[in-house]
């Protein structure tokens, strides 16, 4: 039994949970930044559950792409009409938050349990910007509307192509260290943020090292689905509502975000250089196997080579991402 899972079981049985709902409004929006100096829009206790609404898109761009005006959420129009440009950050993501978790402090770990994700609108969109992985080949911008069949859980790409929907939040993060200031929401980092990791669907858990008092969690960049790499710079972008439970661990320490699914443990590496991101991820994987599974470093290195996939998370956020998928089934025969 690993430390991750032990923590989750203990926390679930020991912590009474209050439940909250946080709607997205101009007052509860963090536009394009993560920041240790941000004022919390909600403060909760460790163990509490929050339903959080998010929005995505630019109303004018969506209408120009052919989306019927009546499908654009009033909340999205209100945000664009009322959030002053001077209060917007250097990035473009519409993030709901920040939420402070009482008692979280630098050196702790924030566990974010993603309990549920709901598709809020009947469409997604893909915007082919001028900053994608192949921007030198595809220099012209384009936005494509992708109708969503939420009953059948598919997106109609067009031409008879249907895409299974696997909604997740591209950006889930907390404040970076105070010295970093107001950081752009686009590059992910030690604070998590714009990880764009498609494995983080409902039923999974994200672990983030805490760098500021209260942690200051923000979430947005909803995706109905995505391919690893996110090569044209966007996924199937859409508005989502998520249900999250927050648990603070004072006696757990991480250097980089990690995650857990029902079937895998996930380690991550982030760096502007893809090779360096892969190196960080491989070292994180070895550290996990040594510290949690009690393997020797040599065996951990070998197991990473023979049984664990290192996948490209995304190539387009400035800071590139690589994540390792560590199957739990590998350890089924280990003595507890």
Language-model regions, residue ranges each:
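Alpha/propeptide regions of enzymes that mature by internal proteolysis
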Residues: 20-29, 35-51, 56, 87, ...
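Conserved mixed alpha/beta catalytic, RNA-binding, or beta-rich assembly cores of soluble enzyme
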Residues: 165-275, 286
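Intrinsically disordered, low-complexity linker/loop segments enriched in Gly/Pro
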Residues: 90-94, 100, 115-201
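Long, compositionally biased
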Residues: 318-336
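Short, basic/aromatic beta-hairpin or loop at an interaction surface
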Residues: 18-30, 70-90, 172-186
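Short, Lys/Arg- and Gly-enriched loop/turn segments at beta-strand edges
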Residues: 57-69, 117-127, 214-224, 314-316
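Extended, compositionally biased flexible segments
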Residues: 57-58, 62-102, 114
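Sec-dependent N-terminal signal peptides
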Residues: 4-14
């Amino acid at each position: 039994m690993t430390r991750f899972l032990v923590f989750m079981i203990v926390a679930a049985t020991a912590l009474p949970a209050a439940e909250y709902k946080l709607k997205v409004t101009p007052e509860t929006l963090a536009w394009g930044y993560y920041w240790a100096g941000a004022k919390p829009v909600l403060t909760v206790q460790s163990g509490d559950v929050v339903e959080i609404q998010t929005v995505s898109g630019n109303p004018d761009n969506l209408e120009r792409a052919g989306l019927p005006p009546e499908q654009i959420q009033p909340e999205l129009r209100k945000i664009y009409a009322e959030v002053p440009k001077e209060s917007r950050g250097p990035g473009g993501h519409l993030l709901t938050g920040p939420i402070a978790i009482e008692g979280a402090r630098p050196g702790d770990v924030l566990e974010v349990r993603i309990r549920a994700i709901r598709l809020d609108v009947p469409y997604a969109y893909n915007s082919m910007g001028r900053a994608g992985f192949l921007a030198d080949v595809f220099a012209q911008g384009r936005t494509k509307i992708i109708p969503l069949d939420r009953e059948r859980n598919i997106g109609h790409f067009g031409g008879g192509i249907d895409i299974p929907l696997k909604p997740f939040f591209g950006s889930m993060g907390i404040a970076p260290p105070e010295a970093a200031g107001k950081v752009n929401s686009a590059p992910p980092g030690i604070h998590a943020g714009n990880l764009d990791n498609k494995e983080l669907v409902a039923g999974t858990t994200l672990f983030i090292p805490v760098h500021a008092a209260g942690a200051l969690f923000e979430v947005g960049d909803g995706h109905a689905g995505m391919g690893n790499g996110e090569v044209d710079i966007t996924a199937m972008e859409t508005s989502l509502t998520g249900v999250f439970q927050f648990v603070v661990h004072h006696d757990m320490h991480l250097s980089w975000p990690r995650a857990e699914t029902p079937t895998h443990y996930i380690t991550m590496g982030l760096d502007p250089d893809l090779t360096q991101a892969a190196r960080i991820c491989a070292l994180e994987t070895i550290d996990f196997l040594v510290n949690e599974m009690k393997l020797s470093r040599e065996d951990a290195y070998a197991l990473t080579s023979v049984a664990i996939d290192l996948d490209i998370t995304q190539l387009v956020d400035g800071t590139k991402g690589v994540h390792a998928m560590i199957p739990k089934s590998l350890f089924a025969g280990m003595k507890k």
